[in-house]
Amino acid sequence: MRIEEDLKLGFKDVLFRPKRSTLSSRSQVELHREFRFRHTQTSWRGVPIIAANMDTVGTFAMAKALASFDVMTAIHKHYTEQEWQTFVQNSSDPLLQYCMVSTGTSNNDFLKLQRILALSPALRFICVDVANGYSEHFADFVKIVRETFPQHVICAGNVVTGEMVEELILSGADIVKVGIGPGSVCTTRVKTGVGYPQLSAIIECADAAHGLGGQIVGDGGCTCPGDVAKAFGGGADFVMLGGMLAAHEESGGNKFERDGKTFMRFYGMSSSTAMEQHAGGIAHYRASEGKTVELPFRGPVSATIQDILGGVRSTCTYVGAAKLKELTKRTTFIRVSEQENPVYGQE
């Protein structure tokens, strides 16, 4: 047994230190980024935010809505091949450029992935997603995916430490997904005692990835636009959002009424709700590591995305970053014991 003494930080532990700026308006900030990926040597340009590959977030409807903002969606893995075929037939190539095809690591998952990617060459992104990215089996699976799809961009995770980021990049991942337990409907940290504060995970994993020419996506833990900006400031190339994009018109799931108000259900992908829906129940050797919540219906996602992008632009003006790419270079975090004045409660 050993203990690491240095303190690890989450988004709530810091604020940006403001700095002199030559920017006169938020409209001058460029949020688009262009990335060149290590293994494929191909490029992608867009706003580097990704809707999470969850049943009630990463939907086809969400992909259509977010693509208009040049924002990416990781489509959840539970759509059938027929549903994918219909979506591809009714979608333009530019829309498909903002979609990731998600997969698990079973043989059936791999065969399904092959058939989906064969539907269109515009499907360039693969998201290989497991809760625990530390197994040898996972790294071996990433190698197989890389060998099979040499021209596709692979995003793989989840991990939270530099050495495993390096392992996955060397195994064939272009982008590594970072985060264990920070999500709003994730209970892994409570159920298992395992995790890593998200901001420190991003800072450490970004350093490891960038040294090898890879990228990371900070997955989870964001509760407001300021957290998204902090993830970028900490070095995340992409930021993945679940709860912040849940309960919208495009989120999937059923709306229901209570006391004259409209709600939608949102649940973690390791929750009992998800396992009952997709695996027929919780296996005897498993425990639920997610929760199910009922959220007030928020309407179309466009207003939420505009609020997030506006917040990040404002962050950039406060620290003097004319481009999102510059934000991490302009970032100085200060440790704090408070984030906001709570006298009137949450907004």
From Swiss-Prot:
SUPFAM superfamilies found in the cross-reference section: Inosine monophosphate dehydrogenase (IMPDH)
EC category name: oxidoreductase
Keyword Cytoplasm attached: no
A matching Pfam family: IMPDH
Residues that bind NADP(+): 108-131, 216-239
Biological processes per GO annotation: purine nucleotide metabolic process
Residues the record lists as binding K(+): G181, G183
Keywords annotated in UniProt: Metal-binding, NADP, Oxidoreductase, Potassium
Chain coiled-coil ranges: none
Annotated signal peptide: none
GO molecular function: GMP reductase activity; metal ion binding
Active site per database record: C186
Reactions listed under catalytic activity: IMP + NH4(+) + NADP(+) = GMP + NADPH + 2 H(+)
PROSITE patterns in alphabetical order: IMP_DH_GMP_RED (PS00487)
GO cellular component: cytosol; GMP reductase complex
EC number(s) on file: 1.7.1.7
UniProt key word NADP: yes
Function statement: Catalyzes the irreversible NADPH-dependent deamination of GMP to IMP. It functions in the conversion of nucleobase, nucleoside and nucleotide derivatives of G to A nucleotides, and in maintaining the intracellular balance of A and G nucleotides.
Record-stated family: Belongs to the IMPDH/GMPR family. GuaC type 1 subfamily.
Subunit structure: Homotetramer.
The protein's name in its UniProt record: GMP reductase
Organism: Tolumonas auensis (strain DSM 9187 / NBRC 110442 / TA 4)
